[in-house]
Amino acid sequence: MREKFKTLRDKFKDKISNLFHKLNSVQKDYYTKTLPKACKDVFTLGSSKSYPMTLNFNKGFCVGLYKGLNSLKPTYYDAPLSTLIIAPPGSGKTAAVAVPNLLNVPSSCVVLDIKGELFDLTAGYRQQVLKNKIFVFDPLGNNNTLKFNPFDKRIVEKLDFNRKRRLVDEVGNTIFAEDGANKDPHWTQQAKNLFVFYALYDLCVHNASTFFEIASAPIKNYVPLINPQSRFYTELYECQSSDNGFVKENGRYMAKVENGVKKMKPNVNVELLWYKQVAEQVYTDPENPKNYDGSVNNLEKDDQGNIIMKEGMLDPIIRNEANKWAKANDKEFASIKSVYSRFMQVFTSYQVKSATDSMSFEYEDLRADNISLYIKIAQTDIDTLAPLIRILLESIAKNLLLKESKKFEERVYLFLDEFVRFGKLPFLLEMPALSRSYGVVLIFITQSNALIEKYYGREDARIVNSTVAYKVIFKMDDLEYAKQVSEEVGKMTRKTRSHSTEKGQLITGGTSSIGKEAWDLLSAQDIMNIDKDEVIILVSGHKAKPLKLKANYYFKNKELLSRINWEVKPNEEVF
């Protein structure tokens, strides 16, 4: 009899065990079964029909491979929405996301390519088949083919004073970004103000400038800039005079000459004379005689006391700034220029000067043409070039938001691999919430959410996590972030049943109760223990339906393998 009861008990335990195993399997695989629902119809890129998860098996940006009955189907999204990719080192984020999409997306792409691997693998195919002009921005390398200067004449001559001022302000904010070690931001802010003055003066007077010229401004030779028509010319040179004062010829003071050389006065602060001269400059043309005849003291004003601006006049803001620097305390000014030189040091490099002395393209060309821009920076040069790379990325991004575009062929992708390495890019972090109607797609790629928090702060990390439409998550060891993702997905409510028996009763007798409990749809352990070749996809608005797909490794795809390592030719030979 005892053996009979033991057999019944073991069978009961086996049934209960199998039941819970099945329930667990259903729960664990729940998120693998939602994609067919989202893709149950025949999707076409650009279709006006709305689909639940904006995913398709046809075209767009590939997030992974869906395992069908007999094949792996590439799964895309074609909306102009941004993506965050979290993948630890060695997980294959480059091989599974960046490379396959660069071999597939036909429109313009801007690619952060620290190792140069993406260029080597994809540039040739993009040039010869996808018909993209190829540029490489590698200022300290030997294969730079891109010129980038946000102050190029082609750009600046289209701008009025307010837009010129906004441009130099934005560039200044990017260069003079404060870090945690900066104990007194006063000097950094003053150095930025000095940058704005130098740059804005050049843009207003010459309609152009370069980083090298602006970086060299505090130490350049100001002697040629003191105009012979200016009263400060007589403070620089020994000038010819008569009983009636200094002699002028054609409105210009005449310097005394000895041995063919103008005779300068000793111990003259020529830089200070230039600031004073600019403080009296009325017109943008330095040769205009009205700059030197006292007109600055008799400018026409409106009823509110504002100077009435006429064509060719220099904005009074520049004169006021020049006057401020002319009156600055010598010791304080020296400290400001020291901080200025520290931030601007990178732009004094002759290699950087060559890479930033003109502009290879206009921002609108990224929409009008197909352009692939690879930003290749050696690991050892990242800290040095980070300010320049930030300026390049933010200049492109901001100018792409000046005009709306919903045409697929005008879409621009920004592949921001290891973007945290280049310092804070606050504007780019906010772009996912703004860029949809402008056709700009940002692909943020990083090794962990913890790195975003380290370089940007917890709040900024929360912003980028909440504004992207898609997340592609590889197997990770970050328990805190795995829990965060699990909480985003949410929980399901399931029924539970408990059974209790009286002492000595094995099966019969006792009581049972039914209750409910919350159960993670996707647990932190699920995330941390997915297979190496799998990814989890979260879609905004559908996070309760996470997808588990196969990673789209290019080296496992014969078609993609046939597209890599093509030769890159000079653009003029192809186009």
Feature map (PLM): residue ranges:
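Glycine-centered flexibility motif
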Residues: G46, G64-L65, G172, H206, ...
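Conserved ATP-driven motor cores of ASCE-family P-loop NTPases powering translocation/secretion/packaging/pilus
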Residues: P432-L434, Y438-I536
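P-loop NTPase motor domains
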Residues: K15, L23, Q27, K59-C62, ...
